[in-house]
From Swiss-Prot:
Pfam families (alphabetical): Exonuc_VII_L (PF02601), tRNA_anti_2 (PF13742)
Example of a GO biological process term: DNA catabolic process
Protein's name according to its UniProt entry: Exodeoxyribonuclease 7 large subunit
Taxonomy, superkingdom: Bacteria
GO cellular component: cytoplasm; exodeoxyribonuclease VII complex
Keyword Transferase: no
General function of this protein: Bidirectionally degrades single-stranded DNA into large acid-insoluble oligonucleotides, which are then degraded further into small acid-soluble oligonucleotides.
Keyword Hydrolase: yes
Molecular function per GO: exodeoxyribonuclease VII activity; nucleic acid binding
Catalytic activity: Exonucleolytic cleavage in either 5'- to 3'- or 3'- to 5'-direction to yield nucleoside 5'-phosphates
UniProt EC number: 3.1.11.6
Self-association and partners: Heterooligomer composed of large and small subunits.
Gene coding for it: xseA
CDD domains assigned to the protein according to its UniProt record, in alphabetical order: ExoVII_LU_OBF
Length: 416
């Protein structure tokens, strides 16, 4: 029966809530098909809280179940398990919330959601998108960090604040996008391509806080994964908590366990860098001090030698040796000069003995014709020729009165 109301006579909230509760209560117990997500078992309580997700639509229903019923399920319930539950919808009037009170749970097969993701994971792995050799190293100090995250989200604060705490001068280009729902993937892909085309962006971080399996589905979407694989800029995945592992973690160049962990990976710690510089300075000073000490030891060793204890004595000894060598050199040179002089005199004497003048001194003569040519035989002159006779001392001009051939030579006396 419809409630009667008007602007002048509105229905109180409590009445509306009560009527909703009555309508919901009329549904009675029903079997519901869905996937288990966001399971919460609180210690010390007998109630298990979880969500039932429609496998074909983005619709979720809060459900509760007695702990003993939940723990009797075989196989052990996990995120994404496809089940059929017997429950009664109840509307909690004080909070105005709807939940399904479950009395029985029956698994109807492995969760389609996880199975689909597993199939996609195998396909991408076979294509080599997870290969370690595809992973690019992060820059030591990026000029600009591209950050893709929800607008004003905790993930944004975690990355920005922790990164600036480590390196205050770090710059960010933040792209605010939807991080769940039907618009998440296209917005993330568009932001990714814009940042990848920016030449000053040296690394891109995709960050989101924790959530249910269905909340994190965009980060296992094939379109997004292939866009990340095609990026030229290194990409860091920082999705959820440490236990969350979307497929983006396998494709990204670096998989950070949390947004805070991503901040630690993308920039160095300025305090650590100062400490390393100080350590390097200490090592350099120690190395120089060690080198100086070693050279000082070498110098002290050299100074301790006797030759350096009294260096003048060695110089004097060397000087005396040089003087001795000079004297020996002079003596040897004088001896060599005297021997050379004697040899020269002997050679001069021999040359003089062999010279024509010496031969003439011994009584020989040289006969020349008027032209100065030497007459060597009687057949070179005729009777009446005038000749010049060169003696050891002086010359004679003579006239040939007789010519005798060699075979009929007459004694000198007969010529006269």
């Amino acid at each position: 029966m419809a409630l009667t109301s008007s602007a002048e006579s509105p229905v109180p909230v409590r009445e509306v809530a009560r009527q909703i509760g009555l309508w919901v209560g009329r549904l009675g117990r029903i079997w519901v098909d869905g996937q288990l997500t966001q399971i919460k078992i609180r210690p010390g309580t007998n109630t298990v809280f979880f969500n039932l997700r429609d496998p074909s639509a983005n619709v979720t229903l809060l459900a509760t179940c007695p702990r003993q019923v939940f723990e009797c399920i075989e196989p052990k319930p996990t995120e994404g398990l496809r089940v059929a539950v017997l429950g009664k919808p109840e509307f909690y009037v004080p909070r105005g919330s709807l939940q399904l009170v479950v009395h029985d749970i029956r698994p109807i097969g492995i969760g389609d959601l996880l199975a689909r993701l597993e199939r996609l994971k195998k396909i991408l792995a076979a294509e080599g998108l997870f290969a370690p050799e595809r992973k690019r190293p992060l820059p030591f100090l990026p000029r600009v960090v591209g950050l893709i995250c929800g607008r004003g989200s905790a993930a944004e604060r975690d990355v920005v604040e922790n990164a600036r705490r480590r390196w205050p001068a770090v710059r960010f280009d933040i792209a605010a996008v939807a991080v769940q729902g039907p618009y998440a993937v296209p917005e993330i892909v568009a932001a990714l391509r814009r940042l990848d085309d920016d030449p000053v962006v040296d690394v891109i971080v995709i960050a989101r806080g924790g959530g249910s399996v269905e909340d994190l589905l965009p980060f296992s979407d094939e379109t997004l994964l292939r866009a990340v694989a095609a990026c030229r800029t290194p990409v860091v995945s920082a999705i959820g908590h440490e236990t969350d592992t979307p497929l983006l973690d396998f494709v990204a160049d670096v998989a950070a366990s949390t947004p805070t962990d991503a901040a630690r990976r993308i920039v160095p710690d300025v305090a650590e860098q100062y400490a390393q510089l100080a350590q390097l300075g200490d090592r350099l000073r120690n190395a120089l001090r060690h080198r100086i000490d070693r050279e000082q030891q070498v110098l002290d060793t050299l100074r301790s030698r006797p030759v350096l204890a009294h260096p003048v004595q060695d110089i004097n000894r060397r000087g005396e040796e040089i003087l001795r060598l000079v004297r020996a050199g002079r003596t040897a040179l004088d001896t060599a000069i005297r021997a050379a002089d004697a040899d020269a005199r002997h050679l001069v004497a021999r040359l003089r003995a062999l010279a024509p003048a010496a031969t003439l001194e011994r009584g020989y003569a040289i006969v020349l014709d008027p032209a100065g040519r030497v007459i060597r035989g009687a057949d070179e002159v005729q009777t009446g020729d005038e000749l010049v006779v060169r003696l050891g001392r002086g010359r004679l001009r003579v006239t040939v009165t007789d010519v005798a051939p060699a075979e009929t030579d007459h004694p000198l006396g007969s010529l006269a």
